[in-house]
UniProtKB/Swiss-Prot annotation:
Homotetramer. The gene is epd. Belongs to the glyceraldehyde-3-phosphate dehydrogenase family. Epd subfamily. The keyword Cytoplasm applies. Keywords: Cytoplasm, NAD, Oxidoreductase, Pyridoxine biosynthesis. It comes from Erwinia tasmaniensis (strain DSM 17950 / CFBP 7177 / CIP 109463 / NCPPB 4357 / Et1/99). GO terms for biological process: pyridoxal phosphate biosynthetic process; pyridoxine biosynthetic process. This is D-erythrose-4-phosphate dehydrogenase. GO terms for cellular component: cytoplasm.
């Protein structure tokens, strides 16, 4: 069965999802039938073809009116602001990938269902009333047919959760702190300009800028037992892609740095292959650009203090890695099964 998807929002994640669909050879499993984006069609096609972070898209891209052709595939382009007016029923859409970064509530998801979609996957953390939050590689096997509205969590949650699980299973995590060192994002300013967050009024290319993060809440969402046991802070740095995460955890059992690295290296070759990677090469952030893994452990930076405090440095391409997990989770949602009429299950 080929899963029919529509992408709502064709920004950084939406475009990377479509590129990943073709570049990773999963076009036989997933067919993109429509993209909804308020920007003009010519701009959508241009930014798909030419990307500052990820280079030129190798597939032939053509656009005529509101039709986008990628290779031999034709995708309908929509410019509809209201979810309820989207033609998902007409297009027989199985799963909507909502990549707007704006929508994420149950009401938003139900609007997609009422429009005819069978399931919805949000590309960012959603409300607590969604049916499930998935970090692929950790809990996607818990998906059920009745999970219609799903969040793919965040890029940083996808990066750190597999590492937390591995360390906790091996030595028992008691508490932890996380520092996200994140590339600049679209909600920052090119030059100083007004923003409700005064730190984000400053030019993104000239400063390391502390910002709020809900990563600790994201950890608790996946592992409720860590409620009030993790804290997180975040800074934005003057690069356009790739993120590093500094994870420190206090563990119950004594451990050596060499044992931590052995565990994480083994996991990258085994149970977490394709999700976690491991390196001891002297690399820098740009070297992880366009890397499809959720997390890449830098073994040269692993430290253990007093046998019970572990510090690790984990890299991720916050765009490309996350876009690949969007595709993985889409396939997992389809594999879990569909109800006969998603819209009929909504409590009106």
């Amino acid at each position: 069965m080929t899963v029919r998807i529509a992408i709502n929002g064709f920004g950084r994640i939406g475009r990377n999802v479509l590129r990943a669909l073709y570049e990773t050879g999963r076009r036989a499993e997933i067919s993109a039938v429509a993209i909804n984006e308020l920007a003009d069609a010519a701009g959508m096609a241009h930014l798909l073809k030419y990307d500052t972070s990820h280079g030129r898209f190798a597939w032939d891209v053509r656009q005529e009116r509101d039709l986008l052709t990628v290779g031999d595939d034709t995708i309908r382009l929509l410019h509809i602001p209201e979810i309820g007016s989207l033609p998902w029923r007409e297009l027989n859409v199985d799963i909507v990938l909502d990549c707007t970064g704006v929508y994420g509530s149950r009401a938003d998801g139900e609007a997609h269902l009422k429009a005819g979609a069978r399931k919805v996957l949000f590309s960012h953390p959603g409300g607590h009333d969604l049916d499930a939050t998935v970090v692929y590689g950790v809990n996607e096997k818990e998906l059920l047919p009745e999970h219609l509205l799903v969040s793919n969590a965040s890029c940083t949650t996808n990066c750190i959760i597999p590492i937390i699980k591995l360390l906790d299973d091996a030595w028992g995590i008691e508490s932890g702190t996380v520092t996200t060192i994140h590339s600049a994002m679209h909600d920052q300013q090119v030059i100083d300009a007004y923003h409700p967050d005064l730190r984000r009024t400053r030019a993104a290319s000239q400063s390391i800028i502390p910002v709020d993060t809900r990563l600790a809440a994201g950890i608790t969402r996946i592992f409720p037992k860590f409620n009030d046991r993790f804290e997180a802070i975040a800074v934005r740095v003057p690069t356009i892609n790739v993120t590093a995460i500094d994870l420190s955890v206090s563990v119950r059992d004594a451990v050596k740095a060499s044992e931590v690295n052995a565990l994480l290296h083994s996991a990258s070759l085994g149970a977490f292959s394709g999700i976690v990677d491991y390196t001891e090469l002297p690399l820098v952030s740009i070297d992880f650009n366009h890397d499809p893994h959720s997390a890449i452990v830098d073994g040269t930076q692993t430290r253990v203090s007093g046998q019970h405090l572990i510090k690790t440095l984990v890299w991720c391409d916050n765009e490309w890695g996350f876009a690949n997990r969007m595709i993985d989770t889409t396939l997992a949602m389809a594999a879990s099964g569909f109800s006969l009429d998603a819209a009929a299950s909504i409590k009106l």
